[in-house]
């Protein structure tokens, strides 16, 4: 809760931390899906460094660049929706997908799948396309009821919020509403729950991909506790990454008096 307090105390520092975590989130969420383009290259792509025309290297590398920037734009959009406390809906989920893939995959961006799919590396078989809208609508109603009943943030409510984030995250992974990009949408929707409640992004690092996938395998629509437990671990690691930054800001404030961070 200390970083939650410091974020409120130093809004400019919080904004900078959110930018850093957004970039980190975009990179690692993409690498979890495909390790062929390593995160060191995704960092180059995200910051538009290196050669200007990425297609000169390969079409796949250029596609990775487009999708990475699309995801970063989608996360920015989610932050604005979170500030308005917009309820989760199918239209929100479709807009998330559309913003991410509108340039790299225009014919499929924001479109719910119309055929059955299998998930690579997972034993779970997603529901038939005819059941997607009904499942999402029912589950989103339950998630919204729990999420927007949260009145304040406390150590006790934090774990409730984490469970809601896990429920939203697992739901999208379970239903697999799109032909592609479901993992990225699932992780982003879980983060949306955290953002609505004033928390930071929960960045799942690729180093823990196997642990993450195992936690998903152990979940069901009635019990997302295994994922919630994993998210607790990954969120603590995320906070550890930004703690030193806030300590620098706090130390300067104590030494020099309130500065621009106020």
Task: Give names to the regions the model predicted.
Residues 1-180, 184-262:
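FIC/Doc superfamily catalytic core
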């Amino acid at each position: 809760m200390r970083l939650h307090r410091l974020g409120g105390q130093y809004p400019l520092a919080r904004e900078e931390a959110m930018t850093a975590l957004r970039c980190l989130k975009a990179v690692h969420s993409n690498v979890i899906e495909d390790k062929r383009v390593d995160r060191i290259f995704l960092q180059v792509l995200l910051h538009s460094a290196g050669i200007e025309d990425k297609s000169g290297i390969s079409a796949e590398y250029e596609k990775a660049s487009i999708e990475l920037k699309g995801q970063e734009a989608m996360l920015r959009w989610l932050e604005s929706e979170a500030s308005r406390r917009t309820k989760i809906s199918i239209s929100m989920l479709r807009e998330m997908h559309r913003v991410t893939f509108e340039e790299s995959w225009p014919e499929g961006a924001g479109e719910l799948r119309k055929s059955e799919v299998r998930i690579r590396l997972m034993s779970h078989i997603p529901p038939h396309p005819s059941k997607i809208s009904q499942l999402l609508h029912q589950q989103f109603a339950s998630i919204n009821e729990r999420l927007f009943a949260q009145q304040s943030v406390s150590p006790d409510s934090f774990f409730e919020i984490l469970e809601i984030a896990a429920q939203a995250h697992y739901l999208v992974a379970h239903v697999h509403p799109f032909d592609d990009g479901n993992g990225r949408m699932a992780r982003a929707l879980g983060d949306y729950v955290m953002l609505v409640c004033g928390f930071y992004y929960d960045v799942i690092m690729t180093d823990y991909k196997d642990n993450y996938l195992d936690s998903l395998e152990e979940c069901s629509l009635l019990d997302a506790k295994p994922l919630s437990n994993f998210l607790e671990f990954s969120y603590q690691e995320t906070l550890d990454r930004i703690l030193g930054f806030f300590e620098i800001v706090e130390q300067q404030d104590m030494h020099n008096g309130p500065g621009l961070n106020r």
